[in-house]
């Protein structure tokens, strides 16, 4: 699908990138069956989320992603002015999201990850290979936003308590969970003949095998994190989501995480990032740089 309504005029680069970011969020939400996450079956481990809300939230972020891409074109280089413009746009996008969802945090982490990647792509649409995109996004993430004086989200608290790498550090290192695990697994599963939905599920599981998911740690502690990582490994070792043994292991993982009230929201955000990067080169083609 495409988030942008049909227009008789060719879409600009910023519009195409915003389309792709929103599509990645919707495709991630729709993917089923995801362990303990919102999907087409239901709300997973959540009581305040459902699929329609995830769709509405994703669509509300289209202007935010477009404006981030526009900012990249305006400033042209990685630096403090662009970083602080992104921070401001991200906070405005978060406010829009919260208005849309009546205060429910659906996509805060995704605004951060996809916002950086959208901006990185807009800085050089001719060089959209995963390593290049993630390197530019990482360089942006490493610049401090001087407008933010304190960091005290649930994720920040978990990082301090457990000494793990959170969403900020994942971005600053150029999204290793996406580059080194999700994208290679996506390609391996496709090459092995898996359908697209199974390949994407396997990519999510590959992220879950190693990610210190702060959403899981916040809700279920180390026990939940171990259950997520080890359970995801069992699914992939059993042949992935396309195999009967893998499906049984995936169902067991789903039930275990639900019992622990552990929802791997950080992994879901990174799957959306993976889908965005995976779709870049085929989606862009010839583009107009006009806003």
From Swiss-Prot:
InterPro entries: CitG (IPR002736), TriPribosyl-deP-CoA_syn (IPR017555)
Gene Ontology annotations of biological process type: prosthetic group biosynthetic process
Pfam entry (one): CitG
Superkingdom as given in the UniProt entry: Bacteria
Catalysed transformations (reactions): 3'-dephospho-CoA + ATP = 2'-(5''-triphospho-alpha-D-ribosyl)-3'-dephospho-CoA + adenine
GO-annotated molecular function: ATP binding; triphosphoribosyl-dephospho-CoA synthase activity
Coiled-coil residues: none
Record keywords: ATP-binding, Nucleotide-binding, Transferase
EC number: 2.4.2.52
Disulfide bonds: none
Top-level EC class: transferase
Protein family: Belongs to the CitG/MdcB family.
Record function comment: Involved in the formation of 2-(5''-phosphoribosyl)-3'-dephosphocoenzyme-A, the prosthetic group of the acyl-carrier protein of the malonate decarboxylase.
Record-given protein name: Probable 2-(5''-triphosphoribosyl)-3'-dephosphocoenzyme-A synthase
Organism per entry: Pseudomonas syringae pv. syringae (strain B728a)
Lineage: Bacteria, Pseudomonadati, Pseudomonadota, Gammaproteobacteria, Pseudomonadales
